[in-house]
């Protein structure tokens, strides 16, 4: 089921029934099983869930960056500004990547080339998508380093990635991603490898730049606290499917899917006291190598009944803008 959106809203990205498979020698992993969501211009959308739930695969499917030998998007549409990205030629897609849609990856050390200076790498991104000279591109790179608040940007322009701290490298990645003023920025766990203080700085930087440049952000994370602080809407994913989506305010006020409630309960809370044991979600995520029968969360769910193991629930609206894929959502939401 696709949630109804405001027809007057400025829809930037519309993902419809997206399905992606990974192929092994003797098996097929159904990594995404019909994902539907949209991103509006200028908004910050959070995508949360445990590792392996399909968050990063969704992003890579949108940008068609999956390894062609082992993965394929087998169904659905990715409509960006009225065009289906899955139908574009590779040349047309290169004009979109890094230009109209940019992505920040988890580990900047492996995303940046170790044999080129940071300035050259940012300048190259500018030259690929704009008709500018090398000198103009380097000037733009310097401007971007200033924008992301890197100290002594003139010197850092000529640094190699290994000469910079983790926080500086991530700032450089943000500078590169935003150098061509994209309409959509996909940030895939951009603070995972950083310490807590630097994480907060990078998050604040992304939000500030979003507001300043008017860029929409699709923020992938496992941290609900980050979502609460930075996003307007949130999608909760589990086993390659969306199990709940709502505004951040509604989700935290009325978590409706049992998995969402379990995620929230597993977050440390000072009100529980030091001696209380942190709740955990029992069991494991089901294998996606076999077709799922029933709800994918049923074996881990304290609310599961017979129908949950027999029939897959569809994403249904609980109230305008808030939907969950749960047979017992009307009961769970009132607990």
UniProtKB/Swiss-Prot annotation:
It is found in: Cell inner membrane. One of its GO terms (molecular function) is ATP binding. Belongs to the ABC transporter superfamily. Probably part of a binding-protein-dependent transport system y4tOPQRS for a peptide. Probably responsible for energy coupling to the transport system. It is a peripheral membrane protein. ATP binds at residues 49-56. The keyword Chaperone does not apply. GO terms for biological process: amino acid transport; peptide transport. This is Probable peptide ABC transporter ATP-binding protein y4tR. The keyword Ligase does not apply. Residues 15-264 form the ABC transporter domain.
